[in-house]
Amino acid sequence: MRGSIMILLDEDTRCLVQGITGKQGSFHTRQMLEYGTRIVAGVTPGKGGQEFLGVDVYNSVEEVTEEMDVNASIIFVPAPFAKDAAFESIKHLDLVVIITEHIPVHDSMQIMEYASRMGKTVIGPNTPGIITPGIGKLGIMPTHIFTEGTIGIVSRSGTLTYEFAAQLTEAGFGQSTCVGIGGDPVTGLGFVDVLERFEDDPGTDAVVLIGEIGGDAEERAASYIEQMSKPVFAFISGATAPPGKRMGHAGAIIEGGTGTASSKREALEAAGAVVVDRPSAIVDEIRAQLGVR
């Protein structure tokens, strides 16, 4: 049996899509269904009673939970309405994946505070989501670059996740689960949360951590990596970024001498992680560390 509760997505995950009738929601719902994800309902206020690709659409999350067993949600709702959508999911469901970007920081803070109070798990916002190859995905990642295996990936960057996954797949290293934690300053699950799950997951033999400049998430991850029994390989993007300039993500900014690529690299290496300078170097390092050719 593939999958594990430790890594968030398994055969028992039954998901609804908030914003299923919108452009992004409808496109990615089709992709998720084709990959085998169990999408059991959609939610768009005012569109209840409709159907999309055989999936019934409801007006609210509560309506869905009254009629069927569902335990996860993925949100494609526009930023101004994302907080209300997230609150609705967090109230009723265990796992909420927020794809939406440009959510105001104050809204994100309220979402995370509510999720913490309710004991629920949030991935994102501004995330590509999560994929467990061979099981399903709750997200927007291109599925053809992923394959089943034992390498876990946790990342702040969607596109770099794809680059590393493609490198691993081409070299014959499949992935257990890949989690995008999101590129915003305020997110749900962080590096440490996901690393803990990978450490406990029998289906994961090693982990690739993809960080970037800004904040201290990688430094906090390093403090946990010291305790891990599984090898961790890391990459930090933004090494050439000038201080004070935001690079791509809202969270990718160096301020006050903290959050630099060099400080993150030093912390990770001191914790025992193998840090590479470019995605193409990851395969050789994994081969060397795991003793495979």
Swiss-Prot record:
Q: What reaction is this protein's catalytic activity? A: succinate + ATP + CoA = succinyl-CoA + ADP + phosphate; GTP + succinate + CoA = succinyl-CoA + GDP + phosphate
HAMAP family (UniProt xref): Succ_CoA_alpha
Family classification: Belongs to the succinate/malate CoA ligase alpha subunit family.
Function field: Succinyl-CoA synthetase functions in the citric acid cycle (TCA), coupling the hydrolysis of succinyl-CoA to the synthesis of either ATP or GTP and thus represents the only step of substrate-level phosphorylation in the TCA. The alpha subunit of the enzyme binds the substrates coenzyme A and phosphate, while succinate binding and nucleotide specificity is provided by the beta subunit.
Q: Which cysteines are joined by disulfide bonds?
A: none
Query: Which pathway or pathways does this protein act in?
Result: Carbohydrate metabolism; tricarboxylic acid cycle; succinate from succinyl-CoA (ligase route): step 1/1
Q: What class of enzyme is it?
A: ligase
Organism of origin: Methanothermobacter thermautotrophicus (strain ATCC 29096 / DSM 1053 / JCM 10044 / NBRC 100330 / Delta H) (Methanobacterium thermoautotrophicum)
Taxonomy of the source species: Archaea, Methanobacteriati, Methanobacteriota, Methanomada group, Methanobacteria
- Please provide the Gene Ontology terms (biological process) for this protein: tricarboxylic acid cycle
What protein name applies here? Succinate--CoA ligase [ADP-forming] subunit alpha
| Keywords, sorted A to Z | Ligase, Nucleotide-binding, Tricarboxylic acid cycle
| Keyword field contains Lipid biosynthesis | no
